[in-house]
Amino acid sequence: MKSDIHPEYGYVVFKDLASSEMFLTRSVLKPEKQIEWNDGNHYPLFEVEISSASHPFYTGQQRILDSEGRVEKFYARYKKQSQ
């Protein structure tokens, strides 16, 4: 491999904001936040809104994430059309 053309590949902690699960893995991401991991070392922290720990496909639980009332708007519109 050529030197100085590849991004630095290091350890990063990914935190799922929906379930508060954390995963230590490797990535080329460079987040500014840091966290102390179980082994006592400090690693960069990257926060994600959803991961395999909270996604309905992987958990088998169906949840509706509705922060702006879109589901209620849909139900109201559907109810008007069906009557």
From Swiss-Prot:
UniProt KW keywords? Ribonucleoprotein, Ribosomal protein
InterPro entries assigned to the protein according to its UniProt record, in alphabetical order: Ribosomal_bL28/bL31-like_sf, Ribosomal_bL31, Ribosomal_bL31_B, Ribosomal_bL31_sf
Q: Name one Pfam family in it.
A: Ribosomal_L31
Which domain of life does this protein belong to?
Bacteria
Could you state one GO cellular component term attached to this entry? ribonucleoprotein complex
**Stored NCBIfam families:** L31 (TIGR00105), PRK01678.1 (NF002462)
Q: What name appears for this protein in its UniProt entry?
A: Large ribosomal subunit protein bL31B
Highest lineage ranks of the organism?
Answer: Bacteria, Bacillati, Actinomycetota, Actinomycetes, Micrococcales
